[in-house]
Amino acid sequence: MNAPSSAAGHVSSHWRQYVALTKPRVVQLIVFCAAIGMLLAVPGAPGLADLGKALWATLGIWLVASAAAAFNCLIEQQIDSRMKRTAWRPTARGELSRTQALIFSAVLCSAGMAVLHEAVNPLTAWLTLGTFVGYAVIYTVVLKPLTPQNIVIGGISGAMPPLLGWAAMTGEVGPEGLILCLIIFLWTPPHFWALALYRAEDYARAGLPMLPVTHGNEFTRLQILLYTFVLLAGTLLPFVQGMSGWLYLAAAFVLGLRFIHYAWRLWRNYSEALARQTFRFSIWHLSLLFAALLVDHYTQDLLTL
């Protein structure tokens, strides 16, 4: 009786290790932003055909994003093993080999590309593949270990999800999708630098040139503050472009000013606890901002009926 139970437990444990490779929380935010792009691209309530395409697009983007996360774990196996934040990952602990991680990533990426190319459209498939290469190869292999501007330059690939969603529904790269992409691009540096502030020793131990390691704590805090002002300006573009109404504009101001408030406090009087709070708020900022944009989108449609 014990042998089947032991085998089942082993399979379950192995499955959890593969799931952990995909960085579920990170991929969840990626898929959320892509879904927002899909819904905003459709005027009014989406029909059955739109929902079907959106579901296929969500599946494909989720698979490729998971593949990129797994490939990142493969490349950073040694780095992850030296950092407290990432030492638990299956590749860092030696629970999964590089070969297993590579095969897993390749299968996920191939499946995702097939779904996007055949069930959505070729443009979305190729843009998603470009995003995979941008994150898994250009950012992870080239930028991250070489320059403190890794987050800024590499942020282009991380900013792509809403543009992928927009392309999935429209078959083109429109200015609206690019604006959504720009917002995430501007949001990325203050988000990650807040994390890097209280993980600076971790990054230094791993030999990664994150901004707090190369330029110091105070300089990084100033950059976070400056970026929050630029980000606030960027979040106004949907209103300027006519993508949104006053409801979104109000939300963008409230959320942006709150982010600036966190950054200001962080710059004036640093503490690790405040850096953690700023990092956590940045996630809420992006999530609530895009949710407000979606609510505004449907509110405007109701008002025009």
From Swiss-Prot:
Cystine pairs: none
Top enzyme category: transferase
Protein name: Protoheme IX farnesyltransferase
Catalysed conversion reaction: heme b + (2E,6E)-farnesyl diphosphate + H2O = Fe(II)-heme o + diphosphate
Residue spans crossing the bilayer: 29-49, 55-75, 101-121, 123-143, 151-171, 177-197, 219-241, 246-268, 283-303
Family membership: Belongs to the UbiA prenyltransferase family. Protoheme IX farnesyltransferase subfamily.
Summary of the function given for this chain in its UniProt record: Converts heme B (protoheme IX) to heme O by substitution of the vinyl group on carbon 2 of heme B porphyrin ring with a hydroxyethyl farnesyl side group.
Protein topology in the membrane: Multi-pass membrane protein
UniProt-listed Gene3D superfamilies: UbiA prenyltransferase
Pfam families: UbiA
Additional free-text comment from the UniProt record: Carbon 2 of the heme B porphyrin ring is defined according to the Fischer nomenclature.
Domain of life (superkingdom): Bacteria
Keywords: Cell inner membrane, Cell membrane, Heme biosynthesis, Membrane, Transferase, Transmembrane, Transmembrane helix
Pathway membership, UniProt: Porphyrin-containing compound metabolism; heme O biosynthesis; heme O from protoheme: step 1/1
GO molecular function list: protoheme IX farnesyltransferase activity
Upper classification of the organism: Bacteria, Pseudomonadati, Pseudomonadota, Betaproteobacteria, Burkholderiales
Annotated source species: Leptothrix cholodnii (strain ATCC 51168 / LMG 8142 / SP-6) (Leptothrix discophora (strain SP-6))
GO cellular component, one term: plasma membrane
Localization annotation: Cell inner membrane
EC number annotated for this UniProt entry: 2.5.1.141
GO terms classed as biological process: heme O biosynthetic process
